[in-house]
Amino acid sequence: MEQLCKRILEEGKALNEYVLKVDSFLNHNVDPKLMYEIGTYFKEYFSARGITKIFTIESSGIAPAVMTALQMDIPMVILKKQKPNTLTEDVYQTTVHSFTKGSDYELTLLKKYISDKDKILIIDDFLANGEASLGAVRLVETAGAEVSGIGIVIEKSFQKGRKCLEEKGYDIYSLARIKKLGKDLIEFL
């Protein structure tokens, strides 16, 4: 997506060879017009699959996921990184390792928000090692539902996430694929 790549080059900052800071438009200060365009691209790519729900992981995937859900006119479910005290009902949970934070968390989904008839599109802000996406996949499949695709805003293609997901048969559609990061260096595929 040309507009996204342009924003990454203009406003993004590679802090090192693994970390890309895009807080000016994606995951702190959010540009709703850009998120709307992102939703348009995901809708166009995934619209023929009979998707019934969008799943995303709190919190940086919420903006692109809600815009995709709005355009596809389907519900969106936010997977929680920890079980809040208010969640007293039955849940699905799986442990996920966060690349960004360097720690584990319990990804949580209320059972009432998924059925075995659902076709799920997973949307996330970044794909690095694939741990978050694989965690979401585990929750969906534990519930007996189908993962119909995975939409990624920014993929770090030099890390193993895409390979891990494709080896398991999942279709990944990334709007910006980064080949290389380095101090003040951002290179796209």
UniProtKB/Swiss-Prot annotation:
Family from the record: Belongs to the purine/pyrimidine phosphoribosyltransferase family. Xpt subfamily.
Annotated InterPro entries: PRibTrfase_dom (IPR000836), PRTase-like (IPR029057), Pur/Pyrimidine_PRTase (IPR050118), Xanthine_PRibTrfase (IPR010079)
Primary enzyme class: transferase
Quaternary structure annotation from Swiss-Prot or TrEMBL: Homodimer.
Protein name: Xanthine phosphoribosyltransferase
SUPFAM superfamilies found in the cross-reference section: PRTase-like (SSF53271)
GO biological process: purine ribonucleoside salvage; xanthine metabolic process; XMP salvage
GO CC terms, sorted: cytoplasm
Native organism: Clostridium acetobutylicum (strain ATCC 824 / DSM 792 / JCM 1419 / IAM 19013 / LMG 5710 / NBRC 13948 / NRRL B-527 / VKM B-1787 / 2291 / W)
Catalytic activity: XMP + diphosphate = xanthine + 5-phospho-alpha-D-ribose 1-diphosphate
Iron recorded as keyword: no
Localization per record: Cytoplasm
Pathway this chain belongs to: Purine metabolism; XMP biosynthesis via salvage pathway; XMP from xanthine: step 1/1
Lineage: Bacteria, Bacillati, Bacillota, Clostridia, Eubacteriales
Any one GO MF annotation of this record: xanthine phosphoribosyltransferase activity
Function statement: Converts the preformed base xanthine, a product of nucleic acid breakdown, to xanthosine 5'-monophosphate (XMP), so it can be reused for RNA or DNA synthesis.
Entry keyword Heme: no
Keywords annotated in UniProt: Cytoplasm, Glycosyltransferase, Purine salvage, Transferase
Pfam families the record matches: Pribosyltran
Primary localization: cytoplasm
Transmembrane segments: none
NCBIfam families named among the record's database cross-references: PRK09219.1 (NF006671), XPRTase (TIGR01744)
Gene from which this protein is expressed: xpt
Residues annotated as binding xanthine: L20, N27, K156
